[in-house]
Each structure stands twice: as C-alpha cells, then as structure tokens.
Amino acid sequence: MPRHVFILFLAWIVPALVEVRADSWSGKSVDFSHGDLCVSPNGRFLQHTDGTPFLYLGDTAWELIYRLNEPEVELYMENRRTKGFTVIQTVILSELDGSDGINRPLINGSPSTPDPDYFKWVDRVLEIAGEKGLYVGLLPTWGDKVDKQWGAGPEIFDEANAREYGRWLGRRYADTPNIIWIIGGDRSGEGKNFTVWKAMAEGIKECDKRHLMTYHPQGEHSSSFWFHDETWLDFNMFQSGHAQRDYAIYRRLLLNDLQKQPIKPVLDGEPRYENIPIDFKSENGRFDDFDVRMTLYQSMFSGACGYTYGCNEVWQMYSDKYSPMIDAQTTW
C-alpha cells in the first residue's frame, strides 16, 4: 500500500474506532427496558422477558455495602460499568464485620429488627447500581450468620426468623428492578442449614415473585447438591474455588449440573480470585490474570450462562483502615 494511501486510511479509521469505543461505553451496562430477567425457553440461559439475551457477567464486591461510602460506591460502580460488567455481587449482612457494630444492619443483632438507616443505605446502593444499568446479585446474609464454621458469626438465624427476614426483604424490594437474589454465602446446604436457607428463600419468594434466585455454596460445591429440585432455585451457582488449576473441577461441577433434570442454567459464582494465594497459602504463589481468563473460557465454552470475576483486594474492599484478609496486598 502506498504511504500516502496508508496515512489517509489511518486518518479515516482511527477516529471511527475512537467514536465506536466511546459510543459502546457511554450508556447503561444493561437496558432494563427489555423487561425483567427470566430463564430462556430451553432452560440453559438467562434472558429478558422480551427475549433479549442476558449475560451474567459478575464482579465480586462482598463487603461493598458495609465498608464503602457513597462516593466510593459511585467510583467503583462506574468503573465496573465502563468495563462491561452486568452484575455486582454483594451482601447485606456482611462477613468481616459481623451483624452489629458502628454501621449496624440490625438493632441488637436481631434479624427481626433491621436498622432503618442501614437499609436506607442498602436502598441507595441499589439505586446507584440501577442508574448505571447494573444488576445487584444480593445476598441477604453471609453464611456465617447461619453456620459460623470459620467465619465471624454470630449465628443469628433459625428457620422461623429466616422466613420472617426473607418476607421483610421480599416486601421491601419486590419493586426494585435490578436485583438477583443469592441465598447462602459460602456455606453448605446440608443438615439444619437446609431448612434455614429454604425458609429464607421461600420467605422472599412469598412476597417477591419478580426476581431470579440462586444459591452461593462453599468451595468446590454447587447449589444443585441440595436445592436443584426447589422451585425457588431458578439457576444453579457453583464455586470452583481457589485451589484447583485444571478443567477437572468444571467437569465435576458444571458439566454435572448441565446434565441434571429439570434443566436449569448454571454459572461459576466464585472462581479463583485474581491475586489470591493459591489454596490460601502464599508460598504456593498467586492466581493471576491468566488463571482468571482460563476459568472464564472453561466456563463459557462448556455451556455456562455467565461468569463471575473476583479480585482478592476488591471483594473485601481492602484499605489501610482494615486488616488484610488472605494476605491482601494493595488497596481496592
């Protein structure tokens, strides 16, 4: 190609590319005018009620509601909007700061008495997300409030108050357009946990039939292990976790879920986080961007309906105000 022709070509194509890029990211991440979310007719994917496909592309921000202020939430969500994320996964009753404290979500630590000021803040977080066309994958509580295990606790839920809390949330957020409910929170659905999680889910669904719902299990497990036949579980979520590096974990979890009846969509709601120590041990090294892309490709090319990204520093909204969890290295 003659040099002058090449220069003319660049003069034409470069502004066009810049314009396309600006147009691509100037609007909302998701156009809510296509209607609420639902499961596709073949049971494999998610879509809007008008038939427009929906890609669940999540980011992990478990501690966002508890730890960030409004300017910080605005900054974070704008960053995620420009990157093309469609869902932000976060928690109402967070893990790291318990169920009570300075920014208390509950009065006297009881799920029967939600703090009005805290839930006005939850409302505002949902509103900011909605303004940017972002869904919020909203966990009513982290799992340690049902089953303490390695968490901070305390255990505050039983079958009765879990159902009551679910009904309260369902009534409050039934008309909020940009919610995807996520029951659980890094815990098993076995034993007594089953009845508590089931009651919470059913309580929400009694008052809110608008929104999709799934369950977030502990590492290397799937919601299908306990809840696949539950009518409230619209799609399965598994956690491939932070220890495995090959396809075997997807063969065991994702492919297994795809073969279950009734057919339900499935996605990895917690794959290996970027910059987290492998198997939680710093001497093993850390997962990097290559490892993240590998989990994305393995999920999507195997038939998942979406994918959730996570970063070790971002999920905990780490800053110098807090002690680092899992050897976090930089601020969020």
Question: What is each PLM-predicted segment?
Answer:
Residues 7-16:
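Bacterial N-terminal signal peptides
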Residues 187, 233-235, 240-241, 254-292:
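Active-site clefts of carbohydrate-active enzymes
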Residues 17-21:
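Sec/Tat signal peptide C-region and signal peptidase I cleavage site
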Residues 23-29, 52, 265, 274-276, ...:
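Aromatic- and carboxylate-lined catalytic core of secreted/periplasmic carbohydrate-active enzymes
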Residues 41, 161, 192, 228-233, ...:
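Mature catalytic domains of secreted/periplasmic carbohydrate-active enzymes
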Residues 1-6:
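Bacterial N-terminal signal peptides that target proteins for export
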Residues 151-153, 279-289, 319-323:
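Short, flexible/disordered intra-domain loops and linkers
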Residues 25-247:
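Active-site mouth of glycoside hydrolases
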